[in-house]
Amino acid sequence: MLVHGRRLGLLLGRSHVAAPKHTSHLPRRTVHLNHFVSKGEAASEAEPPQSTFTVAVKDNIATQAHPTTCASNILRDYTSPYEATVVRQLRRRGARVVGTTNLDEFGMGTHSTHSAHGPVASPAGRSAGGSSGGSAVAVAAGEVEVALGTDTGGSVRLPAAYNGVVGFKPSYGMLSRYGVVPYANSLDTVGLLARSVERIRDLVVGEGLWAQHDDKDPTSLSAAARLRCASGRTGYKGEAAKVGWEGLTFGIPLEYNIFELDPLIREAWEEVAALLQSLGANVVPVSLPTTRQALSAYYVLAPAEASSNLAKYDGVRYGNPGPESENEGGVLYSAARGAGFGDEVKRRILLGAYSLSSEAMDNYFVQAQKVRRLVRGDFDRVFLLDNPLVDKEPTEEGFGEEAEQADLADLHEDVPLLNKRGPARVDFILSPTAPTPAPTLDEALSQTSLDSATNDVFTVPASLAGLPAISLPVDMKEDVHGVGRFAGIQIIGQYWDDARLLDVAVALRGVLGRGLV
């Protein structure tokens, strides 16, 4: 296909992309990974007598057997009086929780380096990704079968890509957030990491997590709404369905072919697209024009919500008051927050508070909400399936079925798109998970906040729209030190199309694993 008159090279011949071999990337010398905050087995009332698989829990998800610190000094000694719903649900399905994992403080970061417990390193000695870096490393190192993380703007998918594992973010409202320490309520989503897509599918679909409404979580979709959403979808009634590639169409978003995209990542993207074509799937270009503004909107909305959520950490309800709090003229919470929060959290609180101020609300927060609606509209326009939570009628913004995508008439005649001036309708969207491979830990520590934010450019749009997305690992060429590096390939589905998305991921991962490409 072409981008601005130049061929991207996605329509290749035979490809050589393959799923990573998890033993090949481990360094010869042991690296201090620092991925667990608390480790140890403890029984729970919800735990069955015979546990069947091991789970690590991100340290911003409440457990009673381990402290819940959110990698912050302000919660250093905090232990939750109750257990998160999703942890209890996994225990009842045979999980044994072996510990809690390190993260960026309160989930705010890209490399799991903003932690009161110190930075996390991947088994390859590189950035573990963030903010669920500890969970991804626990899976990559083979210490657990499944790990829980949270995904606000890519915090499950990015670590999965950096560590060569599978990372799944379900549709917003599917898995309960009760017991999850909030960063941004309208974006936070509990996600799963594992080496096997099948394991994730078994839990979400086979074990029925998708159907579990939680009265304690106001963002949990009601039981009636779940059934209504599932009624227009396939894959929720039984075992994984056999995927018929010939009937599927994958969209390649033109706007994702950015200048900053690493050539090795682009090559992996091209090869997976070519592989899908060789299997019989249709691969076409699509336009998601508002995704260019998605990252900026996210970094207005998420900090704004965070500034409100973190207001409770005042040294009275949470945290320890500092000595200055005893002064009559002092501010009670100033010392507690100053000593308890790290630099990145303080930065985002200030940014969020400003965007909610009277002088900035209209220019920043309100505009960011408009961009968010446009991003969702872009996805709804290109997906074959309708969004069950959205009115299908056209709106003033032009989201409806009659809306047209950007003019693609200059694309090469060989590109299989029937109407290059109308909306291309696809089953799934295929993109890289991250624009670059995992940087070294030193490179990650030296990145500015702006540099780190750009790593989320491909993951944020699905988060803003509340869509399910999965990151699958593929091998890239070895670096100069002979250490294997991974590319994450992301597949995005329409809202509540999680079961079919997981079926496709299982099938694609199986082909990659067999090397039949």
From Swiss-Prot:
Matches recorded under InterPro entries: Amidase, Amidase_CS, Amidase_dom, AS_sf, GatA
Residue span of region Disordered: 106-132
Location, primary (coarse class): mitochondrion
Substrates-to-products reaction catalysed: L-glutamyl-tRNA(Gln) + L-glutamine + ATP + H2O = L-glutaminyl-tRNA(Gln) + L-glutamate + ADP + phosphate + H(+)
Keywords per UniProt: ATP-binding, Ligase, Mitochondrion, Nucleotide-binding, Protein biosynthesis
Active site (record annotation): 58, 131, 155
PROSITE patterns (UniProt xref): AMIDASES (PS00571)
Enzyme class of the recorded protein, top EC level: ligase
Family matches, as Pfam families: Amidase
Cellular localization per UniProt: Mitochondrion
Subunit structure: Subunit of the heterotrimeric GatCAB amidotransferase (AdT) complex, composed of A, B and C subunits.
Similarity field: Belongs to the amidase family. GatA subfamily.
Summary of the function given for this chain in its UniProt record: Allows the formation of correctly charged Gln-tRNA(Gln) through the transamidation of misacylated Glu-tRNA(Gln) in the mitochondria. The reaction takes place in the presence of glutamine and ATP through an activated gamma-phospho-Glu-tRNA(Gln).
Protein name: Glutamyl-tRNA(Gln) amidotransferase subunit A, mitochondrial
Organism: Pyricularia oryzae (strain 70-15 / ATCC MYA-4617 / FGSC 8958)
Lineage of source species: Eukaryota, Fungi, Dikarya, Ascomycota, Pezizomycotina
